[in-house]
Amino acid sequence: MKKVLHIYICGCIFFRQPRLTRLPKKYGGNYAVRIVKGTVNIYGGYFHSSNNSTTKEGTCEVIYLESAWAASSKCVLNVYGGVFETDGDASYLINCKDNYRSKCTVKIMGGIFVGFNPADNTAEGANTNFLAEGYVSKEITYNGKQAWEVTKAE
C-alpha cells in the first residue's frame, strides 16, 4: 500500500520541528520540509527556512528531497499552492540530493516562490524546470521581493 502525506495548512506557519528539520551543523541543512521517502502533496501554507544552512555554499533549501539509499526509496513532491521563502540564497529553494536525484520527482502546479523561478533555475543543473506540464510561472512581487507565481497555462 502506497503511503501519501497530505499537508493542509491555513494561514502562515513556520515548520520548526527540530527532530525532522534540523541536522547537526556538520551535515548542513535547515529545511522547512525534508522528504526521505514517499509522496508529499502541499496544498497551501507558508514554508520558510532561515539563513544558517551550510549546504551548497550557504544556500537555504526550503524543501529538500533526500531519497534514502534503499533501492525502493523514492521521493515525490507535488505542490498545488503555498508560499515558499528563505532568508538566504534561494538558488536551491527546492533541491534534490545529488546522489539520489534520479529517485526524486518534483511537480509544481501552484504557489509563490520568493527569489526562485521553478520553471527555470539551477537547482538540478542549468535550466531546471519543476513545473508540471500545462503550467507556467510569471514574475511578480511578493512583500517587495522578486517572486514567481505558478498557475495553469491559459
Per-segment meaning from a language model:
Residues 1-88, 95-116, 124-153:
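Surface-exposed loop/turn motifs in large extracellular/passenger domains
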